[in-house]
Structure formats: C-alpha cells, structure tokens
Swiss-Prot record:
Disulfide bonds join C34-C87, C40-C81, C41-C74, C88-C102. InterPro entries: Hydrophobin (IPR001338). Residues 1-20 form the signal peptide. It comes from Emericella nidulans (strain FGSC A4 / ATCC 38163 / CBS 112.46 / NRRL 194 / M139) (Aspergillus nidulans). CDD domains: hydrophobin_I. This is Class I hydrophobin dewE.
Length: 109
C-alpha cells in the first residue's frame, strides 16, 4: 500500500513539474497580463525547485499550481538590468523579490 501511495505521489509530482515548466509556445506573456511592473530577476527557476518549494509552502502557495517560472531577487526593470524583462502573472510578492508565473514578454510588445 505504501509503495502504491509513493508511486501515486511521484506520478502527480512528475505531471505537475511537466505542466509547471514553461514551454517556448506558451511562456511569452503580454504586458497587460502582468501583475505589477516588469521585473528584472536575479534568477528564474521552476516552482518545484527543492529550494523554492519549501518557501512557497511557508507562505501557503501550492507550487504545483504555478504556471511559469518563479523569479527570485527581482526588482522593477530598469536600464541596469542585464537580463530580459520578466512579466509575472500570478503574484509579485515582497516588492518583486519573489515573482510567480514569470516569463518573457511576447516579441513586438
């Protein structure tokens, strides 16, 4: 019984990871979809990253429900940013320090 439960949990986690990882086809966002300003993020990771998942859990967020990347150490996008601007569509927490559902803007917008 425990093996079946463990396999079920792994199957659900695997499918959640696959759906949480952005694909090239749907990771681009329109600026009108963004919550808050465009962000310059220190790094982007999957919501199920072993370092990020416990943090999300502490603030009551189900990592498996996030569509897109998690932006870490973000701030409002400006001329000093060396990466492309990120549009976060699910949450912009702590002044952008943690952005949920992040991805690049559609080209041409």
């Amino acid at each position: 019984m425990k093996v079946a439960t463990a396999l079920s949990v792994l199957a659900v986690a695997g499918s959640a990871l696959a759906s949480a990882l952005p694909s090239a086809a749907n990771s681009e966002k329109r600026q009108s979809d963004c919550i808050g300003p465009l962000l310059c993020c220190g790094s982007l990771t999957t919501p199920l990253d072993p370092l990020v998942d416990p943090i999300l859990e502490l603030v009551g967020i189900d990592a498996a429900a996030i569509v897109g990347s998690v932006g870490l150490l973000c701030h409002a996008y400006d001329d000093t940013c060396t990466s492309e601007p990120q549009c976060c569509t699910e949450a912009n927490l702590l002044g952008g320090t943690l952005g949920l559902g992040c991805g690049p803007l559609e080209h041409g917008h």
